[in-house]
């Protein structure tokens, strides 16, 4: 157990569970495989379980931390001079500005707090054009939602939006015993890599988001009912989408097809008016 653990009580409001297993830490560093020429950002360095070994391989590491007590402990570490520290909520961080400053894509990693992991990933998708890849420790249940496919209970809006933006892989299963305090859930370490040649295309991702919101608000309803305010049954037939399917049985590509149809339909209506 890290010496600093006794000096800092994990705060529930920040969802803090600190990684302590040395073998797991080594495996994660190996997975990330950092290069000195890259711009790397760690979200939530905590007690520096990943920060310290990363600094041994890098000349500079950017960290974002919201807990002032943890920053105070971090300042006492021998590798602190290698850090560029941002004391703020990662949900407010401007990665676009960092990209313009560094003039290269950004690699982001971290042991994400369970209470903000989903919100943070959605936030990062909005800045995806400046991100090279993301490597995160997540609650296993959240990771399963990210990679889930049609027909599974875990398949939903998060699955569709995540797979639209990224290729996602679970790389490591992590036991609750690897953390302090010990969480009640299992974790996994995952990689999210923005598509180089995306299998999906939409004119407007906000329309895709709106359609999936309507569909999954009533996930047990069939499409012709859950999406009746957006599409007629004739339109669904025209798009070769089975109107008797439930939201959880519709593929990402079909949701993209719906989004593009609605985009064109809306534009045509604007031209008429």
Curated annotation (Swiss-Prot):
SUPFAM superfamilies according to UniProt: S-adenosyl-L-methionine-dependent methyltransferases (SSF53335)
Keywords per UniProt: Cytoplasm, Methyltransferase, RNA-binding, rRNA processing, S-adenosyl-L-methionine, Transferase
Protein name stated in the entry: Ribosomal RNA small subunit methyltransferase A
Enzyme class: transferase
Source organism per UniProt: Buchnera aphidicola subsp. Acyrthosiphon pisum (strain APS) (Acyrthosiphon pisum symbiotic bacterium)
Record field: catalytic activity: adenosine(1518)/adenosine(1519) in 16S rRNA + 4 S-adenosyl-L-methionine = N(6)-dimethyladenosine(1518)/N(6)-dimethyladenosine(1519) in 16S rRNA + 4 S-adenosyl-L-homocysteine + 4 H(+)
PROSITE patterns attached to this UniProt entry: RRNA_A_DIMETH, SAM_RNA_A_N6_MT
EC number: 2.1.1.182
Presence of the UniProt keyword 4Fe-4S in the record: no
A molecular-function term among this protein's GO annotations: RNA binding
GO cellular component, one term: cytosol
Compartment annotation: Cytoplasm
Positions of S-adenosyl-L-methionine binding: 17, 19, 44, 65, 111
Family per similarity comment: Belongs to the class I-like SAM-binding methyltransferase superfamily. rRNA adenine N(6)-methyltransferase family. RsmA subfamily.
Functional description taken from the UniProt entry: Specifically dimethylates two adjacent adenosines (A1518 and A1519) in the loop of a conserved hairpin near the 3'-end of 16S rRNA in the 30S particle. May play a critical role in biogenesis of 30S subunits.
InterPro entries attached to this UniProt entry: KsgA/Erm, rRNA_Ade_diMease-like_C, rRNA_Ade_Mease_Trfase_CS, rRNA_Ade_methylase_Trfase_N, rRNA_adenine_dimethylase, SAM-dependent_MTases_sf
């Amino acid at each position: 157990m890290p010496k600093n653990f006794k000096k800092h009580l994990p705060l529930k409001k920040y969802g803090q569970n600190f990684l302590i297993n040395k073998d797991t830490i080594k495996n994660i560093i190996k997975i990330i495989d950092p290069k000195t020429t890259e711009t790397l950002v760690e979200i939530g360095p905590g007690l520096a379980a990943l920060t310290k070994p990363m600094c041994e391989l890098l000349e500079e590491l950017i960290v974002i931390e919201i807990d002032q007590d943890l920053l105070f402990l971090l300042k006492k570490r021998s590798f602190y001079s290698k850090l560029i520290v941002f004391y703020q909520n990662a949900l407010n961080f401007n990665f676009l500005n960092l990209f313009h400053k560094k003039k290269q894509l950004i690699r982001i990693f971290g042991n994400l707090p369970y209470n903000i992991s989903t919100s943070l990933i959605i936030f990062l998708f909005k800045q995806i054009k400046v991100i090279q890849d993301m490597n995160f420790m997540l609650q296993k249940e959240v990771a399963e939602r990210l990679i889930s496919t049609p027909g599974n209970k875990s398949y939903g809006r998060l699955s569709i939006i995540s797979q639209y933006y990224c290729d996602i892989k679970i790389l490591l299963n992590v036991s609750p015993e690897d953390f302090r305090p010990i969480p009640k859930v299992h974790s996994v370490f995952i990689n999210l890599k923005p598509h180089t040649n995306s299998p999906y295309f939409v004119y407007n991702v906000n329309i895709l988001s709106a359609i999936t919101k309507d569909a999954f608000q009533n996930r047990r309803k069939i499409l012709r009912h859950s999406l009746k305010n957006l599409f007629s049954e004739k339109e669904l037939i025209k798009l070769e989408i089975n109107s008797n399917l439930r939201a959880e049985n519709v593929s990402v590509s079909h949701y993209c097809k719906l989004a593009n149809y609605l985009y064109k339909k809306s534009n045509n209506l604007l031209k008429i008016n």
